[in-house]
Amino acid sequence: MTAIKLIVGLGNPGAEYEQTRHNAGALFVERIAHAQNVNLVADRKYFGLTGRFSHQGQDVRLLIPTTYMNRSGQAVAALAGFFRIKPEEILVAHDELDLPPGVAKLKVGGGHGGHNGLRDIIAQLGNQNTFHRLRLGIGHPGVASMVSNFVLGRAPRAEQEKLDASIDFALGVLPDILAGEWNRAMKNLHSQKA
């Protein structure tokens, strides 16, 4: 029952990447910040946009790395190191090709599955992969050679609405996630699909 002290939302910086599939994790953190009335502020020390709120007397930090996706670990390691946050106290929200739009799944630990942001976080945390993940389904283009353009593209409206719904589902179980009630959070989240 590990409580979460840091929520990271992966994406790429800049207007050209806003609302792209690859920025699904960043969108999740933006939605948390909005719900908690937190202003995300650029902080060069942590290579990202950061914020903080309190949940049941515990500080919860938010981070959207402003490095490019493949350097996300630089931001995560800097913030987690400074505040002495252990890998198992971190939740990383990211886009997931292996899930359809409208589906969100929680996962504890594991490999990077080809995701460059996760790959760099694992490396920068000293090859520790025990952090939690929120996998936000974006679907797969069907052909490996199309993946790069697919993740860096904007989803059609119907797909975006499903992604937004999956983020809503994840926000609904956020209190359980923050409290470390992983079984309850997984049961509730995994039973929902847009």
UniProtKB/Swiss-Prot annotation:
Protein name: Peptidyl-tRNA hydrolase
PANTHER family: PEPTIDYL-TRNA HYDROLASE
Residues the UniProt record annotates as site (Stabilizes the basic form of H active site to accept a proton): 95
Domain of life: Bacteria
Active-site residues annotated for this sequence: 22
GO MF, one example: peptidyl-tRNA hydrolase activity
Function: Hydrolyzes ribosome-free peptidyl-tRNAs (with 1 or more amino acids incorporated), which drop off the ribosome during protein synthesis, or as a result of ribosome stalling. Catalyzes the release of premature peptidyl moieties from peptidyl-tRNA molecules trapped in stalled 50S ribosomal subunits, and thus maintains levels of free tRNAs and 50S ribosomes.
Catalytic activity, EC: 3.1.1.29
InterPro entries xref list: Pept_tRNA_hydro (IPR001328), Pept_tRNA_hydro_CS (IPR018171), Pept_tRNA_hydro_sf (IPR036416)
Gene from which the chain derives: pth
Site, Discriminates between blocked and unblocked aminoacyl-tRNA: residue positions: 12
Catalytic reaction(s) noted: an N-acyl-L-alpha-aminoacyl-tRNA + H2O = an N-acyl-L-amino acid + a tRNA + H(+)
